[in-house]
């Protein structure tokens, strides 16, 4: 179910304050975060945010198209290695 419009989008305060500080000083640094639930705001555009996927931080460069999505959408947590190509030989 989608979030109620009257509540507005969610972003963790610590992440927003880090981005605001970088925007004031006009620095470009990688910001590490564990907050996959945070919504991407227009202030994030042009920054690289390292989102934790359960074992490492995945660097995500924020573009205009990503605004409104969640950070976790761009750091997949599961690795799919694929099925065995020739499964018939093992069944005989």
Curated annotation (Swiss-Prot):
GO terms for biological process: ribosomal small subunit assembly; translation. Transmembrane segments: none annotated. Keywords: Ribonucleoprotein, Ribosomal protein, RNA-binding, rRNA-binding. The keyword Transcription regulation does not apply. InterPro entries: Ribosomal_uS19, Ribosomal_uS19_bac-type, Ribosomal_uS19_CS, Ribosomal_uS19_SF. It comes from the Bacteria. One of its GO terms (cellular component) is cytoplasm. The keyword rRNA-binding applies. One of its GO terms (molecular function) is rRNA binding. Protein S19 forms a complex with S13 that binds strongly to the 16S ribosomal RNA. HAMAP family: Ribosomal_uS19. Belongs to the universal ribosomal protein uS19 family. NCBIfam families: rpsS_bact. This is Small ribosomal subunit protein uS19.
């Amino acid at each position: 179910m989608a979030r109620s419009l009257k509540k507005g989008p969610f972003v963790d305060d610590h992440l927003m304050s880090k981005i605001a500080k970088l925007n004031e000083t006009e620095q470009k640094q990688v910001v590490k975060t564990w907050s996959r639930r945070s919504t991407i705001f227009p202030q994030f555009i042009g920054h690289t945010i390292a989102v934790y996927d359960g074992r490492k931080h995945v660097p995500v460069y924020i573009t205009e198209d990503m605004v409104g999505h969640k950070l976790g959408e761009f750091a997949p947590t599961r690795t799919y290695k694929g099925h065995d190509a020739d499964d018939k030989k093992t069944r005989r």
